[in-house]
Structures are given as C-alpha cells and as structure tokens.
C-alpha cells in the first residue's frame, strides 16, 4: 500500500492561496497527501493535475480520488516535461504549482527499489522504473573521477576519494550488485571516528547516487523555471526541499526572478523583460513545527519556499 506521511501539508497547500475554481498542479503526487488536501479545497469548477513517474503511485491515486472524476487528472511523467504535458492537455496557464522533492516513503521502504541503506537489495534507485540508468550502472561503470565528483557535489561527502577508491578496487574482482555490498565499502572508506557521527555513514553517498541516477538537480532547475512561466499573475509556486543543493536552486531561482537587474541610470521606465516576475512570499523558508518533527522524523530537513507571480 502506498502510505506516506506528508510533510508541511497545510503550509504548502495553504501557501498557494487556493482559489476554489482554480487549476492546480501537484508535480510530486507520491502518496497523494498534498493532492488530497488540495482537492478538498476545490469546488466543482476546480481541478488538479498530478505528476508522478511511479506507476504504483498513479494507480493508487486514481483509486483513492476516483470520486473527483474529471477534476483529478494524473500524468505519468517526470516533471521536467511539465510545460509539454500540460499543453497536451490544452492547459497554458495554472493558478498554482507545488513540488515536494522528498523521496516518498513507499519508495524508501520497498527494499527491492534499492533506495535504502537499511536493506540489502539490488542496486536500482530509479524513480521511473522504465528509465535505463540504474545505481548498478553508476557504481560499476563510472570512473573513479566521476564517482568522486558526484559524491562530493551531490552528497557533500568529505571522504569521497577514499570511498571511490574502495569501490574501484572492489569492482576489479567482481561487480557490486547490492546495496549491502555498497554500504560495507562506504564504511571501509570512512575513518572509524567519522562513522560514529552524523547519522548513517552511507546516507550522503546514497543521496549522491540517487541524484545522479535520476538527474534530479538539473530536472528540478528546468521544472522550476517552467513552473514560473506556467503560473498566472497572482498564482503561486510552493517548493519543499530536503537538502541544501535543492534549496540553493530554489532560493537562487526565486531570488533571480524577484529582483530587478542593474540597469543603466536614467531610464524613464523599466523595460518589461527586466521587471521581476515573482514576489517572494517567504523571505526565509518555513520549517516543520516541533510537533510535526515528533510525529515524522523524515521531516527534519524539510524547507518550504513560496513565491507569487507578479
């Protein structure tokens, strides 16, 4: 069953300033938590389009929200194709778009998907099960230099070189086939004192491989720009991030689109192309409350940012 505790539920949806007859997009359907609350805010004239790459998530939501009929539309697609998929549905602008960039709990908790360092499973980590690149390919085929780069850039792992060396040496004799084998190599690459602090030693490397397999940062950057273009004036974009790399992309994209660039002095009016597209609703990110953190440990790194189209 596709159960998932939704993070920052009301803050994210209420932050969209819902118009009951509006058109909204949930770019990350998952277990349907945000979609459920958003649908409850709509009248019969409103509708919600929900994206997910995961067929199980799509089928689950179709059953769960069948009573909404044509008000609820699912799209099995990566949200990097946001604009194209909406245009295929005849939709050129919307009232609000939300992103929840956390890996949904069912994906983490299903061992055979290979996302979790707590279970021994085949190295997979694909959000879209039809995608060609897997974690197995990354770990066994990518060069030492490529592994160091992703571990450092995407995982912010201090011991990237040591871990990549362990992987390189091991795979000369046999392929690394499971998450369990990978976890042991990561542990070997991290000095013992460092292994005892900062959570599970494999956390950062697993994050890095998952981001690489799914091209997550580039996809998000493209989709966020598309979302800003697709929302109507007065419409909003809500984004929940779970690590500093995603948050940096969101923060800089919102900031760039909400400020006027340096222009030559003495211009009588600001040309339209230089006028800010966005107004920041959250100057600082909204964080989960203490109560939410007690109920859902996975919310601890969540940050919510909201911007409005001018």
Curated annotation (Swiss-Prot):
GO cellular component annotations of the record: cytoplasm
Methyltransferase found in the keyword field: yes
Disulfide bridge partners, by residue number: none
Subcellular location: Cytoplasm
EC code(s) of this entry: 2.1.1.199
UniProt-annotated binding residues for S-adenosyl-L-methionine: 32-34, 52, 79, 100, 107
Primary location class: cytoplasm
Catalytic reaction equation(s): cytidine(1402) in 16S rRNA + S-adenosyl-L-methionine = N(4)-methylcytidine(1402) in 16S rRNA + S-adenosyl-L-homocysteine + H(+)
Keywords: Cytoplasm, Methyltransferase, rRNA processing, S-adenosyl-L-methionine, Transferase
Record-level GO BP terms: rRNA base methylation
GO terms, molecular function: rRNA (cytosine-N4-)-methyltransferase activity
Superkingdom field: Bacteria
The protein's role, per its UniProt record: Specifically methylates the N4 position of cytidine in position 1402 (C1402) of 16S rRNA.
Family: Belongs to the methyltransferase superfamily. RsmH family.
The protein's name: Ribosomal RNA small subunit methyltransferase H
Organism: Bacillus anthracis
Gene: rsmH
């Amino acid at each position: 069953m596709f159960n998932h505790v939704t993070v920052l539920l009301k803050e994210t949806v209420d932050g969209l300033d819902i118009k009951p007859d509006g058109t909204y997009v949930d770019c990350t359907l998952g277990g349907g938590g945000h979609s459920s609350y958003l649908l409850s805010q709509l009248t019969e004239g409103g509708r919600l389009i929900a994206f997910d790459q995961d067929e199980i998530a799509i089928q689950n939501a179709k059953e769960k929200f069948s009573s909404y009929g044509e008000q609820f539309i699912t799209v099995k697609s990566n949200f990097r194709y946001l604009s194209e998929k909406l245009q295929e549905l005849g939709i050129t602008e919307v009232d609000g778009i939300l992103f929840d960039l956390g890996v949904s709990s069912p994906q983490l908790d299903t061992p055979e998907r290979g996302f979790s360092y707590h279970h021994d499973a085949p190295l997979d980590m694909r959000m879209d099960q039809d995608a060609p690149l897997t974690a197995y390919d990354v770990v066994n085929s990518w060069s030492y230099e490529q592994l160091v780069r992703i571990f450092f850039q995407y995982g912010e792992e201090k011991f990237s070189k040591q871990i990549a060396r362990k992987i390189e040496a091991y795979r000369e004799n046999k392929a690394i086939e499971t998450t369990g084998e990978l976890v042991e190599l990561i542990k070997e690459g991290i000095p013992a004192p460092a292994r005892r602090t900062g959570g599970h030693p494999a956390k950062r490397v697993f994050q890095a491989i998952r981001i690489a397999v799914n091209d997550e940062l580039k996809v998000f950057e493209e989709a966020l720009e598309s979302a800003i273009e697709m929302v109507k004036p007065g419409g909003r974009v809500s984004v929940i991030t779970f690590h500093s790399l995603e948050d940096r992309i969101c923060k800089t994209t919102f900031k760039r689109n909400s400020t006027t660039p340096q222009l030559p002095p003495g211009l009588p009016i600001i040309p339209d192309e230089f006028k800010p597209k966005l107004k920041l609703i959250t100057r600082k990110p909204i964080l989960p409350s203490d109560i939410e953190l007690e109920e859902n440990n996975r919310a601890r790194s969540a940050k919510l940012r909201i911007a409005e189209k001018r």
